[in-house]
Amino acid sequence: MKNLQLESSDRVSKFAIVLVVLSLVSSAYSAGANATEVKSPPNILFIAVDDLNDWVGVLGGHPQAVTPNMDKLAERGLLFTNAHCTAPGCNASRTSLLMGLRPSTTGIYQNAHDWRMTSLVESAVHLPQHFKNQGYKTLGAGKLFHAHTFFDPKYLSGFSDAKAWDAYFPSLTQQMPAEALPEKWPVNSSKDFYGGHFDWAPLPIKTSEMADAKVVAWAKKQLSKKHNKPLFLSVGIYRPHVPWYAPQKYFDRFPIESIQLPKHLSQDVADLPQAARQMTKNKWHQWIVANNQWKGAVQGYLASLSFADDMVGELLSALDDGPLASNTTIILWGDHGYHLGEKQHWEKFALWENTTRVPLIVVSPENTVPKTRCDTPVSLLDLYPTLVEVCDLKSPPQTLEGKSFLNLLKKSGSEQERVAITTQGKNNHAVRSRQHRYIRYADGSEELYDHKHDPHEWTNLATDNRYAKIKKHLASLIPTTNRDPLLPPKKSDTN
């Protein structure tokens, strides 16, 4: 009887052991399955905003800016407060970001330089194409690659690459939908400069009639449904690029009598070298001041910016309400900054802070912490290698010249040294460190600013011997490769 009881007990013990083992195996399998689920490739929502300077609320560029949606996005993740473009012009900046190569490497400095025509980038794979090659579904809408001003017949197509996309709005061969324009233009400026394209005015139309609204409406549909592959969705918002036309309600948010001009110094160009003064030679500032249009232009920019922010809000709401929200990394970036009278300069195409500094916000569920800021200098050139790491992709065939900032996403800390370099034309460069901006032009002339004591860059310290060591160090970081321009710049190359 005892033997039978022992045998029965042994069987029970062995059975219990088997159950424990099976339970452990099941738990391990479940954990592995969960780990696999967590590590599934993230979707990417890639939002490009044209001519977006630091007048975003969270960056404090202008006290009257109304950008609640971009501000809320910054609270969801990491805001880079010291991010800069690689070139202060639409085409050169975007080509550099999308190719992962410096303008000084490609020779693409101007808006007229079609990246598709240079042999140097024939073997390079641009960012959307790389995502497609790595198994992503690539969708796009609006301006990602450069497109001409919408007064130009080439505006609708631009320099896009049809083979990189599974679908594009309005079409694979047309980046931009037709834009709403006043019956007669210019409304407030003059055809004497920029052919009248530099203009601003309210439009008596609904928001949904704007080209950007059509782009965003299409993108919202893509965010509302599931896809059979991880999704790379690029959305290009054209405002606040000139002309600053927007529905009336956006102008109403900024009554002209209450408009504040940007902080400026009347004689701010006095200590600039001749090469720098050449950047203000278009005389737009003189015309605007003489015709009492400075406040009107600022109102136009603020209105267009507010409209663009509403478009960003539409995208974020669609993402949050759709099936992709939990596994989507969001990147919002401006292609370059913009002057509105600072240093008597209007537009971009310069190497000062107002032109190079851009909003850059990253929200990555597995990598970023809400409500964090990072003042380490980063470049838009760094986005390509960062996304390769975030999505665990293979490297593209070209050697990317940017530096991944994935480590900054994870801890929003700092590195021993990191700088952002901006190039305007051949051999004109700016180096931005955490505290200083150093500019050297092709003729050897220089500028140096200390942002700790001079955030508006009103005092050029380049001739102050006390800063010689700092200047020498920053100069040593300037690119040594300075390729000739791909094509001669065109006189009309200002869009």
Q: Where do the language-model regions lie?
A:
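Accessible peptide chain termini
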Residues: 1-2, 495
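Bacterial N-terminal signal peptides
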Residues: 15-27
